From Swiss-Prot:
Protein name: Bifunctional enzyme flvA
Enzyme Commission designation: 4.4.1.-, 1.14.11.-
Gene Ontology terms: cellular component: cytoplasm
Gene3D superfamilies: q2cbj1_9rhob like domain, Type I PLP-dependent aspartate aminotransferase-like (Major domain)
The protein's required cofactors: pyridoxal 5'-phosphate; Fe(2+)
SUPFAM superfamilies (alphabetical): PLP-dependent transferases (SSF53383)
The reaction(s) this protein catalyses: O-acetyl-L-homoserine + 3-methyl-2-oxobutanoate = (6S)-6-amino-3,3-dimethyl-2-oxoheptanedioate + acetate + H(+); (6S)-3,3-dimethylpiperidine-2,6-dicarboxylate + 2-oxoglutarate + AH2 + O2 + H(+) = (2S)-5,5-dimethylpiperidine-2-carboxylate + succinate + A + 2 CO2 + H2O
Protein's UniProt keywords contain Translocase: no
Amino acid sequence: MHDVWRTILSRFKQNTNAIKTRFDKYRALCKELGLQRDEWSESIFLDDLEKLLKLTAKFEMALMPSNGVDTHVNGVITKINGFNNGFDTHINGFDTRINGFHTHTNGFDRGLELWQIEERYRALAQLQSTLGSFFERACPGYDQSKIPWFFDPSYYQCQGVNYDRFASPDVRDREQQLLETLQLGSNQNPKLLLMSSGMASFTVIQQYVVQQLNYGDTVVVSPYIYFESFQPMRSQKSLTVVNAKGFDPESIIEAAERNNARAVFLDPMCNTVGLDTIDIRRFAHLVANRGGWADRLVIVDGTLVSGGMQLYDWFDGPHCPKVLYYESAHKYIQLGLDLIMCGYVVMPEDLVPAIQLIRQITGTVLYSRNASLLPPIDKTIFNFRMSRLTTNAEKLHRLLDAESRNMAEVTFPHHWRDYRWRHGGNVVTVRFHGEGLNKRSNLERCCDDILRAAEEEGVQMVKGASLGFSTTRIFVADAFFENTDPFLRISVGVQSEDIETVARAVLSGIKRYCMSAVPVNLDVGQRLYDAKFYIAMASMLEVRARYAKDRVVFMEGEWLVPILKALGAREEDFDALQQVSHHLGKDPTVDYRTIRNGLFYFNFENKAIQRFQKQRFTLTVQENYKRHDSGLPRDFPEVRGDLQYNTVLQALMVAKAFIMNKVDVEPRAHLDYSSPNFLCNVFNIRTFTEKNILGEPTLEGVHADGADHTMTTFLGCTNMRSDSGITFIHDQKEITGIPATEAQPSLIKHRFQHRHFLDSLLFADNEAKHSLTSVFQEDVSKRATRDMLLFLTRKPKLAGHSSGSVDAMEPHKTLPMNVPLWL
């Protein structure tokens, strides 16, 4: 890729040189005509030009191989010194600074990553564009007295129209360059006109088609064309729009001939989940040799197969229709630089005057300053990039398809070679199996899961519209076609070495998404005919009796596992629960933990546990919580389906509900103890310690959690010292807010430590206070982590509660849950 960018930069330098040459000619012409010039403005131009030259030379150094530095730099200096006509006085001393390059090469960037190369080129391109239009006018003068009103000397006494909306000479040069790059063929002597966007291109074509057709004429479109193109066509009351029944050429031809269509619109590759394709080559061969087609128009949107077809050479025969081709050039043709909106229309030469006039009248031209931002590519660079993108997309498709068939259908049009295209684009689509998984709100969560997985894999990825970028991009796309659902669209990046990592990130993300999006609700009622269920009930009754007596009970994970299985927890969910803490969100208040929170409703009246809508979490000093954020509502990332629909988590809540049911505790102020039901805030927390960060499970020191019944469950740890995470239960007399290390030993009622998976501690929160020791590292060179579940269960709030809020008792809209209670 560095070779490609060195070639582009070489042409970029030629364009800079052309700007300097234009400036020299402009200045010479002004002198010849006796025109006044503003030296202050010119000094700004020259300062910026000097800056551009210097930055370009530095960028070129960063792109060079490690050998040959001095020779190449000396060549740069020679070229810079070659500027003349008075420029030497302004740039005096610049060559001296450049000459310092070969003695200070260590100060230059080495091994630039692709995103850095693109970012720096963008910056240089913007500066060059500014210089190119610095003195130019939108409406340059033909002649003048005393002051100049042009920059490009070709405008002086020009026979054409000096008006930027009519396309400047620079725009016409770019049009020719782009036509040569696309290699669309030579039949009908095609010409290219640049437009301000892809939709501007379609607008111009649509107006031309409407001008050529009569009231009541029919237009046939393939079963799908891009929705923003189809909608304005359908709204034309003077025309009848008919969709062909199939994407095969024969179906499209049959529809056109049956309806006597005057125009046919085709998308060779469609923006649909199936990436439906049309064999344009076969279509062209059939119609060009078929009577009645010479008077028809064929309009082709090649955006997704940019420059991939010898289109005009395929339309070769005695009955060849007029072919108009267009693209959104915001996509592939800009090499992923994303600098401007752009589009173009290609047409037979004899249609140029009519199309050009429409462009002028509608103001859809690509103006000169924007045209100068298009990268100076050629067919070699473009074909190399498109080939690389397609190869990467095919590889990603194979990797995803092999591992995700039970979750989704992954699509890429591998048959592009059969159509004699040069490439197959870089788009891969994903359609999930299962009801509801392809709804937009759910797919947005899928994108979030994939991005978080990409962060964990350390690979670059972007969520956003469009395609053809160097960095892999994901997006929830919508074809707006026959009531079809949205789908996940992946625009695969250009760096081949990243594809396997990208695949791992995408697979990890969609696995999390599928786990979280498919509701799984534990049903204790199905266990009533299993003897193990009643053995578990007897064990829990013993624990419940101890809890009612002692107000605290520690349940070892080894004891809990068969209990939870007897309640219906699935075997595979035990392992999954130990992994869920890898995917938590950032804590908004402290830097030593990641977290998720969800609100659940223990409905003892209807004997069910439900998920409720998110609400902010607040603890106050009045509830024995004394910290810097006491009384402040905290907005935590939400618990997702990967935890909520884990049957072990659901069984833990059922077990807690069974043990705490009808165990009276010291009431808290302004909670509704007349209600038989409880709210349970569930937290999934990872506390970590690493360099300069000490993980504090209870930064607030000795405290209470504003609950009636608190349960803490251990999920796992890494690199944690044996004196970490020790829980102390303190007498109510202990001072709230003091560190655990300062607590009075005589007021410590109990000491527990979670050591093994699912070790759980349940205590009456308002009858004691508690604190924990910090998380310490066993190996100080590595991060230490401690993963926990926290269940804070209380009665609903009443007006006057110290938090200043009451509970919003609403079921969750996108993550419903209804787990039966057996009590």
